[in-house]
């Protein structure tokens, strides 16, 4: 059985417990019995070989057979600030950002935001992260941060980090001359492979001219993703994928 299961409780001893959805998946969906061997992770960066020792109404108890540190993270943190779209598109965005290696997702509150982040929505996104992490093999969870205003997100990103602000260059803000292509921005020298990256993606209606001016004032680099208008989730994943590939290329050089 090659399925991976997430332990909400840190695994520090010879046994682990699965409860709730994870226990249900293991026993009801996978039909695991006592003696079945599975892979566990707890978000610490390690993964564990476990063997089912007991199944009862409370959940599943597993013996920890082995622990191993397996690093499948990007070299350097990648923070994805994005004005979330509505509905199921949120799930798709979160799943793919997790698979591509984003470290943290920050729901942005912008002037034209269409989806307002709530505590229940955040809990739902965190569950999407767990499911995607199980599938893709990461041993650390992408953090779903508390919602942030765009102003705070722009101001708190360290000046030493690479800060990329997705921008449509032909808008009426007058900032076309300040915008560069994503490829050109990522090819610029001056960053080690483990550099920290912050990305900002606007809502369906785009960033307002005031927001674009604030990004430029705070030292963010305005980047274009090409001549086509992309939906929020497409723009977010285009940026994350390009950055992830660039980081891998820098590691190999």
What are the language-model segments listed below?
Residues 1-69:
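N-terminal positively charged helical leader segments and presequences
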Residues 163-214, 220-224:
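Active-site/ligand-binding-proximal alpha/beta "capping" segment
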Residues 28-59, 151-189:
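N-terminal-biased segments
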Residues 14, 34-36, 46-48, 58-60, ...:
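A generic structural signal for short beta-strands and their flanking turns/coil linkers
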Residues 35, 97, 129, 215, ...:
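Residue-level signal for inorganic ion chemistry
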Residues 65, 71-168:
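RNA substrate-binding interface of SAM-dependent RNA methyltransferases
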Residues 209-253:
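Structured adenosyl-cofactor binding patch, chiefly the S-adenosyl-L-methionine
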